[in-house]
Each structure stands twice: as structure tokens, then as C-alpha cells.
């Protein structure tokens, strides 16, 4: 594709996306995709300035507003913000404004969380709200005053004794995550399409023709910009403006911070990059503003951006890339998982080349093909996944992907059990299943065998030294010498680590066996109720379902596992090799075990695996107790995702915060 053709394609794609976003409130492109395409357009135009056209998105502020509401011109334009995607680009921004104002040796910065919502402009006359307008294209928006007045965090009357004749306030209307989830649940129950994210939901809500619907959806508003026409000298800094807004009755984000230099800005950004998951609303970066208004006025604006502010964005959690191949992976349970092999991209701070496609149904639903441009997403610690195929960019002559009918590792026919989405290899001798079983057995949360990672497991299998996890305990140093990665010392260390693993507790061994649906938490629950492998192997489905947290699917999987003759032989082999498949000297069904005796816990947030009841059960079974509020008598706060104020109070009191993994380690015998 020639450069002029690529420029034309980029302009058309960005204009279409901009129109859908600003006018229709129906985005067709993720922010990270738009950013990437926009930066490519900027680069190509900088390299080929003769090809710049007046209608290019780089030469415009936005699109025309929709016609459903009355159009209103903004007295002062609502500019976009320039984006920085790393600290280096932030430093370059500072260098640029310093060249414009060389006499300024040092500036203060105000850092504000970049709320993922919808910008609106409010006008007050003599203290009363007279108009609310959407951002629109930055110069003209839509009047939505009736809807604005339903937002409780926006004052209808300013809390000022002698308000100025005119006050203009800008800020972000947004939906808290809890409210967003409630709305989507209601829409799902009514058969309506779901909002893709809280920002889309906020924008769509503001443009509802019926104010009653807006009122029901409980939007909130953070104010961040103040204009006092005719009284500009009254406020001399952004920090002073925020204080004024709070005094006037507006909600200002409580996490704003005044920074003395760029180092403090970077520290603020890094702190919130990790802590933002605790917030009850979405944020995708930090807005950095020069604090001093005189310096802001000296720097002024470009055609699109204020020179005195920039948005420092968090690493993308969604980004586009191209599919190079589709492979399938056979796991330790025989599950066959398709993976997309892609052009390497940066995603959430890491380089990503593979993403899960989950199963055959998902491939068919996406109609993903080799050569497609796709959007991949990464949330938390999970493996990246493909969430959308950009079919508008699909090359010609692509063909649908055909799922394999035979196992790529052993050649056995693949089967799809009834009522399951996962296709499986059911050959118990499959090399891929054995490899996954060995890796799982040695993993940190199971037997924790140091030095026995994937590459070593592959080496052992290729040299036919092991055929089950039991074979690990018969390995000798002499067998390892001469193999790739092994010398005398490394061989001795691995054999010693395998020997040490024999003393791991029953719950870890149970988890390491790899029974379907029996994760770390369920293994802990089962080991407490059935303190020996004999008792567990003899348990019926009703016995297992009687354990708190164990449902019929898990119970059936456990019973079926112990009925398998090969698994019965494995248990016998492990016991003969010296592993103790029982709780050693401790009856963990009794609360006098003392592991947490006398300890007081408070639970907050959503845990990755445990429910609150399960966590409380484990604490009480181990002699501890759970209370509802944090005090000086609290020993631990068990912290999940999106915790409330309890986490902050615990930190202020110096109380230890525990993740779920750290909590489970406390329960280890």
C-alpha cells in the first residue's frame, strides 16, 4: 500500500470512529486502537507534510453534534488533551513548554485521575444552574440541562454567599462501577443490548430524551475546571480553583495532588497505576496540569490541545494486532485450547504474542482467521484474550479456521463431552497431558519443587526418564548428568528439591493431583473435611456435597478420579515412595488447631477464588474470628479487588493487608 493510500485509509477510519463516538454515542473502535492509528497518521503526515489535507483528523477538533438536542456554542472551547504514553513523552512535554517559557525555572503540577466518563460544561448565573452542555466537538455541544439537573452531585444552586454573576464549570459525568453493573443486569434481563463500558453508558445516559431515565441511572460528577468570566484574576492556580469548586458545592476527586516537580508526578502516576483497581469507578490515566494560571496563559493552546496540560495514560489493556497463526494447546486435563499467535504488541506493560481463543465455539463466534486484525485484552493477571475481529480490515482470500479432529500431541481422536464447550484428548498416555501434569505437580502452589519448570520437564520426557509424577521420586543424580541444563550441582539441587517436596501437606498434594475443578481453595476445604486420602477416596457424592463450598460438579469429578485404576495406582505409588497423603498429626476439622487462634480478621473487596463465606469458614475453622469493622483490635484485613474504605483505614492503623494467596499461606500446617 502506498503512503497516500495509507493516509487516506487512516483518515477515513478515524473520521468514522470519531463520528460514531461523538455524534452517535456508539463507539466502533477501542481507545487504544484509535490512539495507535492516530499516532500513525501523525507520523506519516510529519514525514510527508505535502500530503496533509484540511479535513484530516489531525487538523480538526471533532465532529458536528447530533440534532436531537439544541446545539449550543461553548463560550470557551473544550479542548482535547495531548496524550503521553510513557514517562519519556511526559518529559518531552515539559521540555516543550519550557522552551516557550524559558524564564520559568520551575513549575508546580496538579495531578488529577483521568476519569473515564463524559465531559460536560455547566453555566451558573447569579449562583443558579442555567445550562448544561455536552462536549460535542469542543466548540459546539448539545444542551442537556434537564438531564444535568437529575445528577445529585451537581448543585442546582452554588453554595456561595455572593456568587459571581457568571460561573462556568467543566467536569466529568461518570457511572460508578456498581451502578454500571446494575444497569447492564437490568438490560440483560429485558433482552436489551449491554453497554460496552461505563464511559459509553454515561454518554448514552446523558443523551436520553427522558430525564427520568437519567435520574434512575445515578450518574455522578467530578468538577475539575473553573472559569469566572470578568473575574479571571480572582483565581490564580488550578489548586485554588479546585478548592473554590469544593467550597461552591461540587464534588472534586479526593485523590488530586499538588506536585512540586516531575518526579512527584511520576510517583503519583506509578502509585495509582497499581491502586486504581481499588477505585469504585474507571480511570485510564492521570491528567497533569501546570498549576500556575499566569504560566498557563503564557503557554496558551495549539489548535487542538492546551500546552499546559497532558494526559499520562496507563499502558493499554486493549490493543490491535495481526493474527499470524492459530495453534491448539493440550493441557493437563486433556482440554484442547486454541491460541492466536500474533504480531508482538505492548499490552498492559508487557510484550504479548499469544492470546487465548477459549474453545471451538468462540472461534466460530468470532470467525477469526489467520491474517485478521484483532483486538486483544488483558485484565489483571489473566492470559490475554481476543475480544473482537476487525473484519473491515480483513485481507482477501482468507478462509475460516477448521478445528482439528485429532490430538496434535498423540494423534488420538478428540472428543467433546455432552454439555461441555471444551474439546478434549482422552488418551491418558498423551505426552501433552503428562507434561502438563508434571508442571502442575511441581508448581509453586502445589508441591513447589524448585528447579522443575517447563523446560526441565520437557527434557525429562524427551529422555524417557519419567512417565508419571511418581517417577520423579525415583530419579537419581546420575540419570540427570549429561542432560541439557544439568551439571553435578544442578542435578543434586533438583533431586534434593524433589525429596523436600515429600513433606508438603496433604492439601498441596491433593491440589497437585490435578483433579478437575479442584483448585487450591477446594483442595484446602477437602483436606480439612477428609484428613486422609483413604477417607477422601471412599467419600460418596453426597458426602462431598456436604462440604461447604463443594458442589455437585466438583463432587462428581472427585469420585470419578478415584474410581480410575490408573489414579488408584498413582496414590499407592506415592505412598510407597514416602509421601504422606494425610494431615500429619493435626485434625484440621477442629478449630483448636490454633493456626489463627486469637486472630481477628476483616474482609473487604472481592476475592479471586474464595467467597466471603468460604474465607470466613476457613478463618473460623482455624481458630480465628471475623468482624465487620476495622479497629485497633484487628490483626489482618483480607483484601480483594475493589475494596472499600476499610483498606485505607487499615493502612492508617498499620494493620497488615493480606492477599488471598498470603491468607492461604497462613493456613499451611
From Swiss-Prot:
This is DNA ligase. Residues 591-669 form the BRCT domain. Its EC number is 6.5.1.2. Its cofactor is Mg(2+); Mn(2+). The active site is at residue 114. One of its GO terms (biological process) is DNA replication. The keyword Cell wall biogenesis/degradation does not apply. GO terms for molecular function: DNA binding; DNA ligase (NAD+) activity; metal ion binding. It comes from the Bacteria. The gene is ligA. Zn(2+) binds at residues 407, 410, 425, 430. NAD(+) binds at residues 31-35, 80-81, 112, 135, 172, 289, 313. Keywords: DNA damage, DNA repair, DNA replication, Ligase, Magnesium, Manganese, Metal-binding, NAD, Zinc. NCBIfam families: dnlj, PRK07956.1. PANTHER family: CHROMOSOME TRANSMISSION FIDELITY FACTOR 18, DNA LIGASE. The keyword Transmembrane does not apply. InterPro entries: BRCT_dom (IPR001357), BRCT_dom_sf (IPR036420), DisA/LigA_HHH (IPR041663), DNA_ligase (IPR001679), DNA_ligase_AS (IPR018239), DNA_ligase_CS (IPR033136), DNAligase_adenylation (IPR013839), DNAligase_N (IPR013840). Belongs to the NAD-dependent DNA ligase family. LigA subfamily. DNA ligase that catalyzes the formation of phosphodiester linkages between 5'-phosphoryl and 3'-hydroxyl groups in double-stranded DNA using NAD as a coenzyme and as the energy source for the reaction. It is essential for DNA replication and repair of damaged DNA. One of its GO terms (cellular component) is cytosol.
Amino acid at each position: 500500500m502506498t503512503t497516500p493510500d495509507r493516509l487516506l485509509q487512516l483518515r477515513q477510519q478515524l473520521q468514522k470512529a470519531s463520528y460514531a463516538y461523538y455524534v452517535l454515542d456508539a463507539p466502533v473502535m477501542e481507545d487504544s486502537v484509535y490512539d495507535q492509528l492516530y499516532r500513525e497518521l501523525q507520523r506519516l503526515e510529519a514525514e510527508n507534510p505535502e500530503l496533509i489535507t484540511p479535513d484530516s483528523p489531525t487538523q480538526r477538533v471533532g465532529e458536528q453534534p447530533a440534532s436531537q438536542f439544541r446545539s449550543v456554542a461553548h463560550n470557551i472551547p473544550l479542548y482535547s488533551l495531548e496524550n503521553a504514553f510513557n514517562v519519556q513523552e511526559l518529559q518531552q512535554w515539559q521540555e516543550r513548554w519550557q522552551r516557550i517559557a524559558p524564564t520559568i525555572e520551575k513549575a508546580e503540577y496538579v495531578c488529577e485521575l483521568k476519569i473515564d466518563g463524559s465531559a460536560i460544561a455547566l453555566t451558573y448565573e447569579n449562583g443558579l444552574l442555567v445550562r448544561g452542555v455536552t462536549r460535542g466537538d469542543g466548540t459546539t455541544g448539545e444542551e442537556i440541562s434537564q438531564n444535568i439537573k437529575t445528577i445529585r452531585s451537581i448543585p442546582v444552586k452554588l453554595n456561595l454567599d455572593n456568587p459571581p454573576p457568571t460561573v462556568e464549570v467543566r467536569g466529568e459525568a461518570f457511572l460508578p462501577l456498581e451502578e454500571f453493573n446494575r444497569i447492564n443486569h437490568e438490560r440483560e434481563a429485558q433482552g436489551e443490548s449491554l453497554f460496552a463500558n461505563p464511559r459509553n453508558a454515561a454518554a448514552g445516559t446523558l443523551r436520553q430524551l427522558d430525564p427520568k431515565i437519567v435520574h434512575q441511572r445515578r450518574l455522578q460528577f467530578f468538577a475539575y475546571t473553573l472559569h469566572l468570566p470578568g473575574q479571571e484574576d480572582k483565581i490564580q492556580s488550578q489548586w485554588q480553583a479546585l478548592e473554590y469548586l469544593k467550597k461552591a458545592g461540587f464534588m472534586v476527586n479526593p485523590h488530586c495532588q499538588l506536585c512540586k516537580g516531575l518526579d512527584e508526578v511520576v510517583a503519583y502516576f506509578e502509585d495509582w497505576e497499581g491502586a486504581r483497581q481499588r477505585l469504585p469507578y474507571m480511570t485510564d490515566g492521570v491528567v497533569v496540569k501546570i498549576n500556575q494560571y499566569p504560566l498557563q496563559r503564557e503557554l496558551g493552546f495549539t489548535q487542538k490541545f492546551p500546552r499546559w496540560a497532558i494526559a499520562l495514560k496507563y499502558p493499554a489493556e486493549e490493543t490491535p494486532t495481526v493474527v499470524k497463526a492459530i495453534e491448539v494447546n493440550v493441557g493437563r486435563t486433556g482440554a484442547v485450547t486454541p491460541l492466536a499467535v500474533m504480531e508482538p504488541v505492548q499490552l498492559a506493560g508487557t510484550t504479548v504474542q499469544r492470546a487465548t481463543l477459549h474453545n471451538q465455539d468462540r472461534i466460530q463466534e468470532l470467525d477469526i482467521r489467520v491474517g485478521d486484525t484483532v483486538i486483544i485484552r488483558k485484565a489483571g493477571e489473566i492470559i490475554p484474550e481476543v475480544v473482537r475481529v476487525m473484519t473491515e480490515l480483513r485481507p482477501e482470500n482468507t478462509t475460516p479456521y477448521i478445528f482439528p479432529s485429532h490430538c496434535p500431541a498423540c494423534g488420538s481422536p478428540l472428543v467433546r463431552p455432552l454439555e461441555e464447550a471444551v474439546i478434549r484428548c482422552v488418551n491418558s498416555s498423551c505426552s501433552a497431558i503428562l507434561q502438563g501434569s508434571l508442571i502442575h505437580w511441581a508448581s509453586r502452589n502445589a508441591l513447589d519443587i524448585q528447579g522443575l519448570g517447563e523446560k526441565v520437564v520437557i527434557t525429562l520426557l524427551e529422555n524417557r526418564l519419567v512417565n508419571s509424577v511418581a517417577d520423579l521420586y525415583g530419579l537419581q543424580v546420575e540419570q540427570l548428568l549429561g542432560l541439557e541444563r544439568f551439571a553435578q550441582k544442578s542435578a543434586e539441587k533438583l533431586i534434593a528439591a524433589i525429596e523436600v517436596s515429600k513433606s508438603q501437606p496433604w492439601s498441596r498434594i491433593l491440589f497437585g493431583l490435578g483433579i478437575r475443578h479442584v483448585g487450591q481453595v477446594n483442595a484446602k476445604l477437602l483436606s480439612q473435611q477428609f484428613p486422609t486420602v483413604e477417607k477422601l477416596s471412599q467419600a460418596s457424592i453426597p458426602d462431598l456435597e456436604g462440604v461447604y463450598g463443594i458442589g455437585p460438579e466438583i463432587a462428581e469429578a472427585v469420585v470419578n478420579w478415584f474410581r480410575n485404576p490408573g489414579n488408584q495406582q498413582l496414590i499407592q505409588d506415592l505412598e510407597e515412595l514416602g509421601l504422606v497423603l494425610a494431615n500429619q498429626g493435626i485434625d484440621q476439622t477442629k478449630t483448636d488447631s490454633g493456626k489463627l487462634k486469637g486472630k481477628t480478621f476483616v474482609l473487604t473487596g472481592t476475592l479471586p477464588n474464595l467467597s466471603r463465606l468460604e474465607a470466613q469458614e476457613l478463618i473460623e475453622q482455624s481458630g480465628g474470628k471475623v468482624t465487620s469493622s476495622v479497629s485497633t483490635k484487628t490483626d489482618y484485613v483480607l483484601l480483594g479487588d475493589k475494596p472499600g474504605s476499610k483498606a485505607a483505614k487499615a493502612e492508617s492503623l498499620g494493620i497488615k493487608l493480606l492477599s488471598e494467596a498470603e491468607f492461604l499461606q497462613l493456613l499451611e500446617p
